[in-house]
Amino acid sequence: MIQHIRNFSIIAHIDHGKSTLADRIIQFCGGLSDREMEDQVLDSMDLERERGITIKAQTAALHYQAKDGKNYLLNLIDTPGHVDFSYEVSRSLSACEGALLVVDASQGVEAQTVANCYTAIEQGVEVIPVLNKIDLPAADPDRVIAEVEDIIGIEAKGALRISAKTGEGVDQVLEMIVAQIPPPEGDVDAPLKALIIDSWFDSYVGVVMLVRVVDGVLRPGNKILLMSSKANYLCEEVGVFQPKAVSHKSLSAGEVGFIISGIKDLKSAKVGDTVTLADRPAGEPLAGFKEIKPQVFAGLYPVESNQYDALRAALEKLQLNDASLHFEPETSQALGFGFRCGFLGLLHLDIVQERLEREYDMDLITTAPTVVYQVVLRDGKITEIENPSRLPDLSSIEEIREPIITATILVPEEYVGTVMTLCTGKRGIQKNMQYMGRQVMLVYEMPLNEVVMDFFDRLKSVSRGYASLDYEFKEFRAADLVKLDILINSDRVDALSLIVHRASSQHRGRELAQKMRELIPRQMFDIAVQAAIGAHIVARENVKALRKNVLAKCYGGDITRKRKLLEKQKAGKKRMKRVGNVEIPQAAFLAILQVDGK
């Protein structure tokens, strides 16, 4: 039986047609009836459908009768394409022996295509190149085949030419999967070993674990042991997704399916853990995945302070399905009680915020995203700081190190100049530049905090949307960094603090103060907005008070009478300023992102 199993995933850049091809394959194999079929059938979240992106990996077990007359079981594992979710891709690939590399025949190879393909090759997966969208008038398959060979370096002469939209060539893809992807290796009689690829929480049955069985057989009623936590559970149900969940009598070596065993806490079923039988455990656990560390941090605060507990509950529920989301409570003088949350990137932050607002009906204030800095103190201690307002006193700091990433940018040659200017402006150091057909591959080392700000949007705008970016963390490196504070009426607003490079700090301070002046609504008293580095004020702007014309009722009359009224108004404003609070709108917290550190 194991000879007739094929485990494969589909890897591609965003918008190259992964989910559409998955739909066609499911339809072709009869996984869903025409009535149940809908676009992006594996994208189960509404958010995934609306944005046209895949966030969570999904699976489908399909039966296919090949032209040689044999019946095959195809396990399709769908993967995300966005750089923020690249860890999901490596998890999906670890359960496969093969991968379809889908490339848009009009767009050509893009940065995530390269990154995901290298991940597949590193994991020893058989890669089958597929050119999609050949029905488009702009399709140029010959150029794209040359690009695949030049940039990625895999043989692509015999690449399949298909159109997932119309279904043309899908049957050839299935035949290619059967012919080229090797069957899984595994021993049905050995002790059970199953790798947890994903786990999520279901309110009816508890935690559902998606596993790839490597050796052995698992049946409902078996006692299972999770090897990292040494916890025992009773296996209640096993089965596969076709894409709807279907219960089976057993899961055996080579198969991909789900296990339900009444686990209440997602932390117990860690992704990358090995499941084995309690009464006949495996000797060694399988090689898991490296822990994913959040790259970007932001504060999430409820607009109403009585919503704090509801926000905690909502974050805990989201964390059940998204192990890469980290959060811890924090307080801010300006915003009250909230949470410091860690994300994989800006898209991840955006999606979490939108899910909180949409699914849990929360009203949130989000502070500008920051990255983790390493601070070396004079006594030799090293601490990691993800909130700029927690930076220790400058006199006790030896050096501040910022995270550096290696960014790979693929861009058509006519936009190379503007992209290089942008990277240099973001303190990038060029490491490599290769011409590949009509595209150029640029490799830069850049500080992550420059990328987090607005790099992605600016890259798209200077290249008219053609450039694509992939990055990975390299190291922490010492830099000349300072903390920029914003003072409103001489009070520091901790949520507006940020860490910037000294060279651009004055400019950033001036721009930020100007931006604040525009965004803070006028009150009945003057508001002073100042930008400060330590005790040194680098910029000041005033938000002028709204004032009533107190002289309106004086027709002519004595100047002293007018002066008395004006003095009285001035004294009232002064008193008001002493007790008055300034409401800072949400837009002001995100203004940091729009300020350009030139």
From Swiss-Prot:
Its EC number is 3.6.5.n1. Pfam families: EFG_C, EFG_III, GTP_EFTU, GTP_EFTU_D2, LepA_C. GO terms for molecular function: GTP binding; GTPase activity; guanosine tetraphosphate binding; ribosome binding; translation elongation factor activity. Gene3D superfamilies: 3.30.70.240, Elongation factor 4, C-terminal domain, Elongation Factor G (Translational Gtpase), domain 3, P-loop containing nucleotide triphosphate hydrolases, Translation factors. PROSITE patterns: G_TR_1 (PS00301), G_TR_2 (PS51722). It is an enzyme of class 3 (hydrolase). It comes from the Bacteria. GO terms for biological process: positive regulation of translation. Keywords: Cell inner membrane, Cell membrane, GTP-binding, Hydrolase, Membrane, Nucleotide-binding, Protein biosynthesis. It is a peripheral membrane protein. Signal peptide: none annotated. It is found in: Cell inner membrane. Residues 3-185 form the tr-type G domain. It catalyses: GTP + H2O = GDP + phosphate + H(+). Belongs to the TRAFAC class translation factor GTPase superfamily. Classic translation factor GTPase family. LepA subfamily. Required for accurate and efficient protein synthesis under certain stress conditions. May act as a fidelity factor of the translation reaction, by catalyzing a one-codon backward translocation of tRNAs on improperly translocated ribosomes. Back-translocation proceeds from a post-translocation (POST) complex to a pre-translocation (PRE) complex, thus giving elongation factor G a second chance to translocate the tRNAs correctly. Binds to ribosomes in a GTP-dependent manner. This is Elongation factor 4. It comes from Nitrosomonas europaea (strain ATCC 19718 / CIP 103999 / KCTC 2705 / NBRC 14298).
